[in-house]
Amino acid sequence: MANERPAQQSDIKLLISKGLEQGYLTYAEVNDHLPDDLVDPEQIEDIISMINGMGIDVHEVAPDAETLLLNDGNTGNREVDDTAAEEAAAALTALDTEGGRTTDPVRMYMREMGTVELLTREGEIAIAKRIEEGLSQVQAALGTFPLSTELLLSDYEAHKEGKKRLAEIVVGFNDLIEEADAAAAALAAAGPVAVDEDAVDEDADEDGDDDAAEEEAGPTGPDPVEVATRMENLANEYAKFKKAYVKYGAEHKNVAKAREDMAAIFTTLKLPLPLTDALVTQLRGVVNGIKDHERKVLHLATTVARMPRKDFIRSWEGNQTNLEWVEDALKRKQKWSSALRDVKDQIVSEQQGSIEMEKANYLTLAEIKDISRAMAYGEAKARKAKKEMVEANLRLVISIAKKYTNRGLQFLDLIQEGNIGLMKAVDKFEYRRGYKFSTYATWWIRQAITRSIADQARTIRIPVHMIETINKLNRISRQMLQQFGREATPEELAKEMDMPEDKIRKVMKIAKEPISMETPIGDDEDSHLGDFIEDTNVESPIDNTTNINLSETVRDVLAGLTPREAKVLRMRFGIDMNTDHTLEEVGKQFDVTRERIRQIEAKALRKLRHPSRSEQLRSFLDID
């Protein structure tokens, strides 16, 4: 890379020198001198602008001599400044290096995103069909797995008991969809239908978005009666399969036929994605259980008993549930036979576990693995197609995320949330409705971004429903401000929003953003907001000084009394003590009665009320 840069700079210098000499360059000449990995249109536009700024015009084709003469009259006589050309070449090379070889993740993301071509409507439909084919293969594999049928029937029973919605179990019928597709294909093959142009609404939406919206708004979901009929048929076929399994065993042809009949009905039902995921997880759990037993046997035979791995694999294949396998291996009388005999019971126990799994799933281990492989193939096919659809629409996320900047989340976070919404849109896209994917995905992307802003943008999280109320309140407040020329009162807002006034005040209080105590204040920004907020937990300097002066003055005044009178007052009012005392407590201290203490206190207070003493304390009185 270091050796390439001087060569590029030299090429660009020659290009600029040529442009200065002849007064123009063609786009082809510029493109020939740019690196192959520079594909960002904005970077190329910046380079063209920099060349134009040097007084070099860039044309599609070379202009004729007459045009050049009319434009300037100095063509061919411009002074070539080598230093300027070198500086410009270095700048352009740096620009190119920044665009083509950057390590900035944002630029790398943008560049890689730009290499993926946009999809046409036909391309979107082709990918959507591949996704559908992959999911159909997954469902076809699940249909041959009896426990999938059992779980589906169990969920339908929960629906009949009112515990689940029908949409959580069945969303349509695959065979009816295929029939509709075949009819549409036959209609298309028949050729275009003559249309009366006068009867066509000129304002009709070309993309069919309004029709799609109306279709979505109408009644959706499968016919409950039809679902009930098919579920009943599926339950009957499942019962026949179990009966045949009990009678003939897993490998009998009658059992295979019953399983095919059951799968044929299962695959006609279009299942929602959450239920499909649950069925896939169930099958994976069974396969993982089988592999767990096999891993334990492998460990016992090869690690503990020291049986060669190749010998184990060769003899174990097809004997996973053969309880005589260990005995057959011992008959070979190898050097590891003694150690294998020691772990025989453990191996047989694991084989018994595999046999129990066969019985529980009504299939042989080989059949379960075949179903798992078919399911994995369909998943991989659908996942690859979904990846293509997502990558082709990443630009859409960028364009939508730009509208939500400066709302509390960084731009990259907005893109990430938008991409999550895009993936959900890919999962739920139905190409048969006729609208483009971008039309459908925009709503999902926007919802994902706005939801993330509501959840994450604020320092103190506010629930989404409250965010919606706050946004509505702000919108109505702006409208009333424009209408009346002043801020609306809570009473007016409550009337306009048809909400209680106390709730309006609560929403207005919640809507306030927290502010940092370190917020700079003033032009110099040398002080912070926290410096101007009063700390009510700390005594103010004025009050502190006043209390000190009051204490000193009280001591001086008490010094003018007899020691006995001063002590009585100190104890009665708690002066310079932890607490005050009752007449009885003071009397015990002086060994006199309560009445005598009351008389001493009254006499001392009369002395303090004398103007010569009271004047010193009067200034401390609150005359507010």
Swiss-Prot record:
Entry's localization field: Cytoplasm
Residue numbers spanned by region Sigma-70 factor domain-4: 557-610
Any GO molecular function: sigma factor activity
CDD domains (UniProt xref): Sigma70_r4
Pfam families in UniProt: Sigma70_ner, Sigma70_r1_1, Sigma70_r1_2, Sigma70_r2, Sigma70_r3, Sigma70_r4
Compositional bias per record (Acidic residues), positions renumbered to this chain: 197-217
Top-level taxonomic group: Bacteria
Cysteine disulfide links: none
PROSITE patterns assigned: SIGMA70_1 (PS00715), SIGMA70_2 (PS00716)
Gene Ontology BP term (one): DNA-templated transcription initiation
Region: Disordered, residue numbers: 197-224
Region (Sigma-70 factor domain-2), start-end ranges: 389-459
Positions occupied by motif Interaction with polymerase core subunit RpoC: 413-416
DNA-binding region listed in the record: 583-602
Annotated keywords: Cytoplasm, DNA-binding, Sigma factor, Transcription, Transcription regulation
GO cellular component, one term: cytoplasm
Subunit (UniProt): Interacts transiently with the RNA polymerase catalytic core.
Family the entry assigns: Belongs to the sigma-70 factor family. RpoD/SigA subfamily.
Job of this protein: Sigma factors are initiation factors that promote the attachment of RNA polymerase to specific initiation sites and are then released. This sigma factor is the primary sigma factor during exponential growth.
Full protein name: RNA polymerase sigma factor RpoD
Species per Swiss-Prot/TrEMBL record: Xanthomonas campestris pv. campestris (strain ATCC 33913 / DSM 3586 / NCPPB 528 / LMG 568 / P 25)
Designated gene of the protein: rpoD
